[in-house]
Amino acid sequence: MVRPVSRSDQAADSIVRNAMFAGASKLSGAAFTAVLTIFLVRYLGPEEYGVFALALGVGGLMTVPADLGISVSVARFIAERRGDPDAMARFASDAIRLKIFVTGAASLALLVVAGPIANAYDTPDLAWPLRILAVATFGQSVMIMCATIFEALGRLSVYLRVVLAESALEATGSIVIVLLGTGATGAMVGRAAAYSFAAGFGLVLVARTLGRSIRPQRGGHGHARRILGYGSALVIVDGAFTVFSQIDVLLIGAILGVTAVGHFDAAYRLAGLLLFIGGPIRSAVAPRLARGEGGPDREALELTLRYLVLAQGVILAPLIVWAEPLTRIAFGTDYLASADVLRALAPFALLSAISPLLAGAANYLGAARRRVPIALFTLAVNAAIDAALLAQLGIVAGAIGTDVAYVIYVGAHLHLCRDLAGLRLRPLVAPLVGSLSAAAVMGLVLLAFGTGADLAVPLVVIGGALGTAAYVAVLLVTGQVTREERTAVWRRLRPAA
């Protein structure tokens, strides 16, 4: 039985509160992921970690067939019906029913083809990690749907509990199991157990938040066709983007081998740990673009994009200037070959701040079909550059392909949001110039401390703090942050009287 729901349970939180809790979810997950990734990279070594990374890359291709656009599609319909818990619960119930069949079938398919895939890569040790990943895929897909539902409800504070549970279980469980000598297979067992628990926990919290039963009903509530209808376009978009995120790993594995995969993936994940801003902001802002009561909130989108452009530039200088010391500190000297990849991924890192928000806004605006050609074209560009340059340039070619394709992807989504929500692009030019100028000054500060791989950790900490201060100072001096904005921030930060 579902407990009675209070008005506060159903009311959506503010953008700031949702962003804070989404950020906390992302940051806590990133912290656990950082610990686990560094442990696995160091303990397993490049070859065995390469097997683990390749398994995740192959399994990542199952993300789309395991979802069929259900998660984002149901989130859109729920966001359009805020204030009607009965309608929201019916959509959630039908989505869960679809998930059981769709995700279950995809996981079973991965289980069946694990052996042939391992043989195709001439890596027998890949088979069991893939088989166990089939279980993790089911739990992860259900957990993702719970995330989108809480996003649509504007109750990301509740979802934080799910993230903490999954992240803690995966990190601790995987480390303990790997220490028993189970290698990449053991790491995958920890992942599967954590996602399975998180999936069940997330569904319980969704039901409690709505105060309604979301148990799937025989025959459903009549929303399955609508969910799958909008999801059909999202399947193509998500499929292309999923392949986009894995194509570098897959092509590097096929052309250069699993050790090269380990070096590339380590740098890619390190860059990803710095990119936690875009996702939480998307979760807080994008649902407000749904065409429900009040219509798309263009002002929220414009203001958020401005702040993202100003803030995200702070990561450029460390990625470019300190690629070697950051790689050595995180992964050790065996991974110094990853430094060039980390440096080359700097443009991708910058664009990743605003990309999730733009994509999420388009989805809630009901424009999934217009995103299809954008996604397919950027995937083709990335794959073409990789195929053409990997043999000549090595793993850095993967970063180049990602950068070029992402420039196209983000630019196209900016124009899409302009057409659908009236987004004004000119006001973003000044913040971008200011951010790049501040990053250049920050880079000079970091250069003063040295760039060698042997740079001491205390110097990295001190230099990073001074460089960040220089970055903020440039934004203030150039007027990118107004007096009113500084006053508002101070009011939020100062202690209550």
Regions found by a protein language model. Name each.
Residues 1-9, 447-497:
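Membrane-proximal transmembrane or re-entrant/amphipathic helices at the cytosolic face
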Residues 1-4, 93-122, 172, 176-180, ...:
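Alpha-helical transmembrane segments of multi-pass membrane transport and lipid-handling proteins
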Residues 1-33, 86-89, 93, 126, ...:
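N-terminal membrane topogenesis motif
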Residues 11-71, 103-111, 136, 170-171, ...:
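Signature of the first transmembrane helix
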Residues 13-33, 55, 68-115, 128, ...:
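Membrane-water interface segments that mark the loop-to-transmembrane alpha-helix transition
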Residues 17-37, 165-166, 190-198, 202-206, ...:
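Transmembrane helical elements of multi-pass membrane transporters/channels
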Residues 79-97, 263-376:
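Specific pore-lining/lateral-gate transmembrane helices of multi-pass inner-membrane transport
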Residues 128-131, 160-211, 377-384, 392-417, ...:
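Hydrophobic alpha-helical transmembrane segments
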